[in-house]
Curated annotation (Swiss-Prot):
This is NAD-reducing hydrogenase HoxS subunit gamma. One of its GO terms (cellular component) is cytoplasm. It is found in: Cytoplasm. Its main location: cytoplasm. It catalyses: H2 + NAD(+) = NADH + H(+). It comes from Rhodococcus opacus. Belongs to the complex I 75 kDa subunit family. The keyword Acetylation does not apply. InterPro entries: 2Fe-2S_ferredoxin-like_sf. SUPFAM superfamilies: 2Fe-2S ferredoxin-like (SSF54292). It is an enzyme of class 1 (oxidoreductase). The gene is hoxU.
Length: 33
């Protein structure tokens, strides 16, 4: 697993997950096309 920080929120997740999915789970919206 890896630890990333998004908007000041530290999230631990698996390496195979996408950043957009992890951000959404943490309550952070990242606009996509």
């Amino acid at each position: 697993s890896i630890e990333i920080e998004i908007d000041g929120v530290t999230v631990t997740t698996e390496e195979s997950r996408t950043l957009v999915d992890v951000a959404a789970e943490a309550g952070v919206y990242i606009p996509t096309l």
